[in-house]
Each structure stands twice: as structure tokens, then as C-alpha cells.
Amino acid sequence: MADRRNRCNQILLLAYQSFGLVFGDLSISPLYVYKCTFYGGLRHHQTEDTIFGAFSLIFWTITLLSLIKYMVFVLSADDNGEGGIFALYALLCRHARFSLLPNQQAADEEISTYYGPGDASRNLPSSAFKSLIERNKRSKTALLVLVLVGTSMVITIGVLTPAISVSSSIDGLVAKTSLKHSTVVMIACALLVGLFVLQHRGTNKVAFLFAPIMILWLLIIATAGVYNIVTWNPSVYKALSPYYIYVFFRDTGIDGWLSLGGILLCITGTEAIFAELGQFTATSIRFAFCCVVYPCLVLQYMGQAAFLSKNFSALPSSFYSSIPDPFFWPVLMMAMLAAMVASQAVIFATFSIVKQCYALGCFPRVKIVHKPRWVLGQIYIPEINWVVMILTLAVTICFRDTRHIAFAFGLACMTLAFVTTWLMPLIINFVWNRNIVFSVLFILFFGTIELIFVASALVKIPKGGWITLLLSLFFTFITYVWHYGSRKKYLCDQHNKVPMKSILSLGPSLGIIKVPGMGLIYTELASGVPATFKHFLTNLPAFYQVVVFVCCKTVPIPYVPQKERYLIGRIGPKTYRMYRCIIRAGYKDVNKDGDDFEDELVMSIAEFIQLESEGYGGSNTDRSIDGRLAVVKASNKFGTRLSRSISEANIAGSSRSQTTVTNSKSPALLKLRAEYEQELPRLSMRRMFQFRPMDTKFRQPQVKEELFDLVNAKDAEVAYIVGHGHVKAKRNSVFVKQLVVNVAYSFLRKNCRSPGVMLNIPHICLIKVGMNYYL
């Protein structure tokens, strides 16, 4: 009984919190739906039946798409609790070979969160349809492009939502005051600038206000709706019957169909409900929507319909005109607050989708900021923040009329919903293992409805929808070009990797001079020796005594448990002292800015050495072989092989180095000193600990010797070697490929964050190796 009560309390708490982050965009739609619906030819059909028909369309659109499609079906297609367009794609990539990146390993499937509980789909034989997609590269490319189009629509919505939300919330000032429309636009721009400028500070100090603001807003609009129903037309409840939809199209004809571009605005923000699923639970979101959001919105739209059925002249400003005069200013203030909350949630969703896109190799490297005091999962991306702000201001100033912004907004939201509708049948068939008949029925029912709305929205392209096409094409081009270039570069690395025979033929010394220290060679290859290593030895025939090839890769799951992130293996015989470390992360994982990476790496390698000597064959050992890589996961004994103590020698050495540089008068050395002092705190933290093998008896003396070599190498010096590539298309490539690789992809590589910054590598420990790539 106590557990059941605790579960209920948890659901209620999450449902309460979801109002501030999930339902903001959907809840402010009443500000502009009727205004945009009765635009164009429909203004000439000002009858009660037309008003009732518009409300009936709104009611059934919310019911069929928001309530049934999303609450019943789409929310069930979560990826370990995460939602969004990339969650669906990741699910498909795990249950079928749909990914175009060839760096997936069998060991990835052994992650505890890779498959859901009770998931038996991996043991089922592949269907003919599934095998057809897996074998056909064009089908997989088409699926990826579909996902990237959906991703681009999310970013476009991130541009348009703040513009239409803030502008619509203060539109009432034009009708109620003598302010000019240009003045109202400037007020909206000022609010938008303030919203984006404060993004870098996070929302942890004000996030507790979001839910109360949205709940109060929903109660206000529901109360206003009830007031208008009782005051103006109590018989409006009859419009709940779909019969009025028939009457609507019978009386309005083509004008009624064109007005669907305004009707569809009633479900804008529904996709955000699914995208923000990871912050809450499907049960809590369903509870909040069905018990509060849905009835409040229906009452508000019904109330506006009752008011408009007796006041046709109020159509251009239907929402604020339906508010009683004594409550106008309080409602205006609440509308502005609700618009800011809704905009904040969409901006956060934009950061999140860009992070996921980058993690899965579909977006250029950008700075991702997460501070410990922020809400779990909250991130900030400076480049995206300023680009979205500039685009939002440009849309607000250029369009001025919120109806034109709304038409662009509606096209983006409906296209995103349409993409989800096309992905869901694949989920039903491949992930849920339901009969293909259910997939066909799903896409026929919901796809037909949404196709009608999309067709109506496309007609609005000259009246504002063109901005959606322009932005979505721009972002789709960027994401696909980056994915294409990254995939070609990976395949080039894979083709040019050094054969193991040539490494083994060099002997333990590798034919070079070995110096004390540890060299970490970063590569995208999950197997084999990268050409970067050979290129380095060719130009400088000396290297560190311990070599570790580090591969940071993203697995198509939201989060990888910390104890399962490091996969350690050996390259060549033990005397070579060459290891491989594969660091796996989920597409929602945020890299910590901590300085314990070197310590974790040394501990992991030491664990691998000991487990290898013990012939450990328990459940923690992955017996799969990736080339010459034996993948071993951390055991329960992890961290017990080495002891750690504070190194006074390194601290003293740092002080001596600083004194030497300070006394120098060389401008070059003084400049180097400035960079060194900037990195000194981080470097000191990385070097302040020394490792020593535990006082245990080793069955094999070679194990103790190898552990001492590992520890001494770490204490001596750790250097990070990263390839610095120059990418060009092959001379015999077609013109389009040369344009994409030599111009677009090269431009993105030169103007995005460097790998060293993304990997949190200290600048003074970084060595870049130049490489030429001909794709």
C-alpha cells in the first residue's frame, strides 16, 4: 500500500512539473488559432454554423492527433524513457541495421540498457521488409534524410515559437492602447533578446515558477471559456458533433479547406510533449494532459466560438476581445509570462535535439555546456543560441504580422508530426513486432488526416510558409553534409589503417626510440591501428613507452551506465605495451568537465591487465573479438588493483617550471607561460595523484612489471595525439561531390569547434598530426 501511495505521489509530482516544460507551446495556441483560421476567403463566411464548424474541427483535431495519436501511441514508443525524433531513429537502429555508420560492434549489444526488459525482437527472424531495408543503402539513406528533415523542423520550430508566442501575447496592446504596431514589434524584440541573453545562466533559479505560471494560465483561459459559453451562446456544445464539420465544408467549399492551415495551429507543441518525455514519464504526462490541459483547451476554444458566434467583428483579435475588460491587463501579463515559459521550453528542446544530432554524427562540433547546479539534462549551446536569436529577431521584424509567422509555424509543426507518423509504422513492425497490418492501418488513418493538413499548409507558402522551407532546407543540408563527410572520412580511415602484420614485424620497440610517458592517440576507428600513428612515426621516429588508442563513440541508446563505458583491449603481444580504449556514450549523455579521465583510464587498463592474467571468464567479460581487440568490461573488483596517493614531486616540478619561464625575457616563452598558466589548474589536478600497484601477490611477475610500467608512464607524462585532417574530394569525383566535400564540408570543419576542445584536452598536452584525406 505504501509503495502504491509513493508511486501515485511521484506521478502527481512529475505531472505538476511537466506543465512548465511540456505543455507551454500547446497551451498558448488559443492566442492565434481563430485569428489565423478566419483569414482570407473564410472572412466572407461569418455565420454561426461556420464558427461552430471551425470549433468542431479544432476539437476533433486535438482529440485525434494530440490525445489519441500522441498520448496513446507515440508516447509508448519511448527509448528507455526518452522521446523525440532521434529516439525513434535510435530504436530502429538498435532493432535493425539501419545505421549508416560502420563503427558499431557486437559488444555494444551487451550493454544492459541496449534492449528493453522482455525485449525478444533480437531473437526473432528478420522479415522480408526489414531485410530489404537493411540490404538497400538507398533505403537507409532515405530513412536518415527523413529523420534529418524532422530534426531540421525541430530547429525551425525553435526559431518560430519564440517569435509567434511573444508577438501574439502582446498583440492585445494594439487594440487596447494607442501604441503603433511597430512599437509593439520593438517590445517583442526586446523581450526576445532578454530571453536569449539569459540562456547561459540556466533556469535552475526560476524553473520552479514555470509550472505554477502554466497551471494558472490554463485555469484562466478555461475560466474565460466557461464565462463566454454561459454569457454568449450556451448551445455551442452542439459543435462537438462532427456533423458541423460537414456543414462547415459544405458552406465554405475551397475556402474552408484553405483555412485548415489555421486550424492545425491548435496542435502546435504536441510534438514537444514527446520530445520532453525523458524529463518525466509517459504516465505523468498522460495524466496532466487528460485531466487538465485537454479539458482547459477545449473549454477555451469552445468559449471563443461562443463569443465569436455573436461578435463576428472581433475575429481579427478574437482572444483578447473575448476577455472581459476588467481582466484584460492581468490576462495580458499572464499571457506574456506563459509565452516566455513556452519559448524557454522550446529553446531547451532545440539545444537537446542539436546535442543528439551531434552525438550521432549529424551535426558539426559545437560547445555543449552543462553546469552541476543546473537541472539534470539541461544544456546550453552558445552557437545555436545566438543563431536562433538572430533568426527569431529577423522573423519578428520582417513579418510583423503574427498570422504570417503562424502559417510558417503551422507548416513546420505539421511536417514534423508527419515525419513521426511515417516512423511509427516501422516502430510498430520492427520494435513492437506487431503485424504489418497494424502499421498500414496507423499510417492510413493518421497519415491521411495529416496529409490533408500539410497540403493546406503548403498553400500558405507565399504568405509566410516559405521561411519554414528555407530554414528546414538550410539545416537539413548542414546535417546531411556533415554526416556524409564524416562517414566518408571514417571509411577512408578504415581503408588506410595500418595492417597488424606491419606492426608485429617491427618488434616490441616498433623500430623507434621509446621515451618515458603515455601517448593517447585519438581515433574514430573501433578496431585496427590508424594511419595517424604511422604518419607520426614516419616524421618523428620516437614515441612514448605506453601507447593507448582511444576511440570515443556514441551508441544509439540514451545513456550508457558508467561502469560499462570503458572497453579495454590489447594490441599485439604484451611486450608492446599497446592498448585500445573504447569510450562509449549515449546520445543524451553529457560529458563531464572533470579532470579524472586519466585516472579512470589507468585504472581501467590496470583492471584489464589483471583480469587477463587471471583468465577471468565471468559475466563481465565480453568474449567477442574485434580484430585483435578482446573487449573486457569492468568487474566488481574495479579500482582495487592500484592505490592512489598525492604526488608532491609533480606539484614541485610545476612550480620550478613556472619559475624558470617567469625569469625568461623571451617573448615566445612569455606567451607560452600565459597559455601554461591558463591550463595549470587543470593540469595540476590531473597530475597531483600517483598510482602504485596494491600490495598483493601476483601469480605472474610479468603482470606486476606491466602494471609498474603503466603507472610510471602515467606519472612521467601524458600526451594527447589528435589527427588534424585536410579533406578533399578525389580528382575524378563528380562535380556535386567536389562541391559538397571541398566547399560545404570543409567550411563546416574549419568553422566548428576543434576535436581537442570537444574532448576537453589540455592545450599544452595536445599534439596535432597533419593528415590528408581524399574522399
From Swiss-Prot:
Membrane topology (Extracellular): 32-54, 165-177, 227-253, 308-327, 400-407, 457-463
Protein name: Potassium transporter 3
UniProt cross-references to InterPro entries, sorted A to Z: K+_transporter, K_trans_C, K_trans_N
Modified residues (Phosphoserine): S647
Family in the record: Belongs to the HAK/KUP transporter (TC 2.A.72.3) family.
Organism per entry: Arabidopsis thaliana (Mouse-ear cress)
Reported phenotype of the disruption mutant: Loss-of-function mutation results in the arrest of root hair growth.
Parts forming coiled coils: none
Membrane-crossing segments per the record: 11-31, 55-75, 144-164, 178-198, 206-226, 254-274, 287-307, 328-348, 379-399, 408-428, 436-456, 464-484
Cytoplasmic side: 1-10, 76-143, 199-205, 275-286, 349-378, 429-435, 485-775
Gene Ontology biological process terms, A to Z: cell tip growth; cotyledon development
